[in-house]
Amino acid sequence: MSKELIQQVTAPNGSVFTGSGTNSYLIGREDITLVDPGPKIDEHIEKLIKLGEGKIKRIFVTHTHRDHSPSAKVIGEILNVPLMGRLVEKDDTLQDKTFKPERILGHGDLIETAEYTIESIHTPGHASNHLCFLIREEKAMLTGDHIMNGSTVVIAHPDGSMKDYLNSLALLRKYSFNKIWPGHGAFLEDPMAVVDWIIDHRLEREKKVISELNNFSSVTSEELVKSVYDDVDSKLHPIAVWSLEAHLYKPVSYTHL
């Protein structure tokens, strides 16, 4: 039996930020594209190289947060294969400084092999350099941290943008796919329902931000998060503050909604 065209391999880095761990993907059987090789953990690096069976030809990253791209440099040097992705527009402490792409992937770029075609889709929001990858033959979208299973994603200002994030979610409606392979968690079906739910959830949260702001003459983000995210475990409020501030920094207008 031939192996699946898309293999998901989860890194052993589970945490409150990463859920069960960061998902790496091996695309293809004979001409493999490795997507999001993950954190620099020897066990995970060795597993990916072993599963690749000497057939990994290139490495893509969805974005350069430190749970997604640090292994790219290591594996790229071991296998002598090129790194492809984008660099951030506004640097912050979340970024992997070791990622230096040989090729900058633009919106709509295609990588074509005898087995599959990958389309690069620029989806800023979670990070300014975030990309999703459509595997056309499988009608599958690799979403990195644009969409996760089990949690909504953190939008951390200044590199993260709530306005860009919502526009990028709406952009996915233009593509034909029936399965989401996320950066964290298991695959998701009925993708348009997932996209619509996330957009609605974020807009409802924004309404709550505006409503709660009216109750204060002066308030800090740390105080405001308690009422805006009162449905979220208080242990997660320090993380939720990032998304709260992204709502506060966001202009009102959206392009695609």
Residue ranges of predicted features:
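Conserved small/polar residues in nucleotide/adenosyl-binding loops
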Residues: 255-256
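Conserved beta-strand hairpin/beta-sheet module of binuclear metal-dependent hydrolase folds
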Residues: 2-51, 132-144, 149
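Active-site HxH/HxHxD metal-binding segment of metal-dependent hydrolases
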Residues: 15-20, 39-117, 139
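Short acidic, hydrophobic short linear motifs in intrinsically disordered regions
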Residues: 218-230
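Short helix-to-turn junction characteristic of helix-turn-helix DNA-binding domains
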Residues: 213-217
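Short, hydrophobic-biased segments on the C-terminal half of alpha helices
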Residues: 245-249
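Short, positively charged loop/turn segments that connect secondary-structure elements
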Residues: 230-242
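Metallo-beta-lactamase
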Residues: 34, 39-40, 117-208, 212
